[in-house]
Amino acid sequence: MFMAKITGSVVFTKKEDSLTGKKLMIVQPVDANGENVRSEEVACDSVGAGIGEYVLVARGNAARSVFAEPNSAIDSAIIAIVDSFDK
């Protein structure tokens, strides 16, 4: 699991069936100071997060289990909106 800031959204018309009805967001992984730590990624949103919000992102089986779809094409999922963080 890692913390990230949502920087954008992804619009798609043709997709793998398991992505139907899912909202994909562009997330920028950040450290405890809110500084960027690596390249942006795409994650499937499970909590209704919006651009500019800090979120927690899960990967792999943990991400797929959020949607109860163990065989889906989902690799990363936004699982929480961060209210605050401090170091």
Can you say where each PLM-predicted feature lies in the sequence?
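N-terminal first-folded block
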Residues: 1-35
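A short, acidic/glycine-rich surface segment
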Residues: 14, 38, 63-67
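A structural micro-motif recognizing beta-strand termini
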Residues: 30, 44-46, 60, 82
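Short alpha-helix capping/helix-loop boundary micro-motifs
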Residues: 39-43
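C-terminal structural segments of small proteins and small subunits
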Residues: 56-87
